[in-house]
């Protein structure tokens, strides 16, 4: 069987983490099997679909390194084909027009609830006589079109993740609406389960890989495949992604879209790495820190768990820090320089920028951390409480005055690590204080705090702007 898989997002919002994980599993499976990964935009919800969301989906997938093999299919462009299929189902007796009003359906559901029953359509208009149908039309009622589902029907399939699955027709909510309300002489807008079957068949999809929240849809869609005498694809239902409280991850949890993760400073490599781990168990001997192109060679649904995956921020942050620490200084600077420019910061030289990222990179977890850590090199900082206390020590002013006098006789462009160390040693000896006092006082004066990366390297970088002199002089 030639493997053809697809991602079918709805452009009613930005690319969600769960959708991106589904895309990743489809892409990995296609690569492993030498197959084809396709993209279908399910834009039949005209009111909520937006062009900017389509672009966000494209951008998010490409940022993650997930590229599709053929031009994207736009579902709304096939509406005539969908309606023709619905007409065929009606003509063959698999579907019918239902004239029940929304008020009648609401009353039906309320009655079922009062009687302790699960709400479901009671198939009341499945067998209308021509006379009854004529009366509904005369009264001005517009029908939906429903697909017949027998309560006695058992639907089974072998799921690549969950094994043998069986659903009963009585658990599917009654006869299924496949077209929205429209005048009786027309067909309304086709609905999800019908158009998915039509498009997956037209695209020759061999495997449908999606979340476990689609299990009931799969049972309904298999009935449609059978009624239309179409080849039924292989199904695989991936585990849900849960939040820290064990509930399905949603917008209420804050960051859920790929574009938001990108803005926060997560790397595409770490995101793809982590999303693969949300439901897929790493085979023995394989490190959890990997590139998805490597995993595509070993990916298997046998290693995808049935149990839901819990989103772990600590794990994602660890992976992101690993990716950053593995970056060359050149690559890290490429990521940071646009952010520096957004803040109005300009590098005195490329070499200076390389030295800066080499200094701050080891402590970065997010790309955006580099902005916070680089800020003291571009902008003078307010004194922290510990910085104030340090500079209140009476010897601090003497130390800083000594260092400033020596700096005035030093060329900023040639100031080096060796000269900085020599100057600290001179201050220690001349001011008759401990070296630690000199270094703490100097750090407080230069950067406003007692914490930060290596002081000597930081000082050398700051001296390229001659800002060390200005910052020390204002405190004396």
Curated annotation (Swiss-Prot):
Superkingdom of the source species: Bacteria
Gene responsible for this protein = gltX
Q: How does it assemble?
A: Monomer.
Q: Does the keyword Transcription apply?
A: no
Q: Upper lineage ranks?
A: Bacteria, Bacillati, Cyanobacteriota, Cyanophyceae, Synechococcales
What organism is this sequence from? Prochlorococcus marinus (strain NATL2A)
Question: What does the entry list as the binding residues for ATP?
Answer: 251
Motif extent ('KMSKS' region)? 248-252
Q: What EC designation does it have? A: 6.1.1.17
Return the GO cellular component terms, semicolon-separated: cytosol
Molecular function as annotated in GO? ATP binding; glutamate-tRNA ligase activity; tRNA binding; zinc ion binding
Q: Does the keyword Repeat apply?
A: no
Concerning its family, UniProt says: Belongs to the class-I aminoacyl-tRNA synthetase family. Glutamate--tRNA ligase type 1 subfamily.
GO BP terms: glutamyl-tRNA aminoacylation
Write the protein's name: Glutamate--tRNA ligase
What is catalysed by this protein? tRNA(Glu) + L-glutamate + ATP = L-glutamyl-tRNA(Glu) + AMP + diphosphate
Location of this chain's protein in the cell: Cytoplasm
Q: Which InterPro entries match?
A: aa-tRNA-synth_I_cd-bd, aa-tRNA-synth_I_codon-bd_sub2, aa-tRNA-synth_I_CS, aa_tRNA-synth_I_cd-bd_sf, Glu-tRNA-ligase_bac/mito, Glu-tRNA-synth_I_codon-bd_sub1, Glu/Gln-tRNA-synth, Glu/Gln-tRNA-synth_Ib_cat-dom
